[in-house]
């Protein structure tokens, strides 16, 4: 099975690079963007399986990015996880179709579980078959 690709959009370089290291260590391919323009470009060019998006990014902010991505036929099915230090945006995020809203500072294990769950749900919605391991008893 091919590695899943995740687009991380955050203008804080240390956050983005730290997340990239953690995601790569967990077996994901990772691409980075630091503003709204790069986020749109990379989402359309790279076709990620999931987007991790900060709210406070240059060029319009994460909510504008999410809204435009969800309106585009090419990107509307990509799950979006907001990862942000901005409290109070959960309702707006979910109205825009977010899969999750995670506050910074985040617990790495919880974020990884959230990513895994969003990818599993997305895979099921896209029509991919999800196979369960079965054990035969003899």
Regions found by a protein language model. Name each.
Residues 16, 58, 76, 104:
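The feature encodes the CheY-like receiver
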Residues 27-34, 42:
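Short hydrophobic/Thr-rich beta-strand motif most characteristic of the beta2 strand and flanking loop
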Residues 35-38, 61-65:
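Acidic catalytic/metal-coordinating carboxylates
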Residues 46-52, 57:
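Active-site beta3 strand of CheY-like receiver
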Residues 123-138:
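CheY-like receiver
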Residues 20, 64, 86-103, 110-113:
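Alpha4 helix (beta4-alpha4-beta5 surface) of REC/receiver domains from two-component response regulators
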Residues 81-83:
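Hydrophobic/aromatic residues positioned on beta-strands within the core alpha/beta folds
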Residues 17-25:
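Charged docking surfaces used in two-component/phosphorelay signaling
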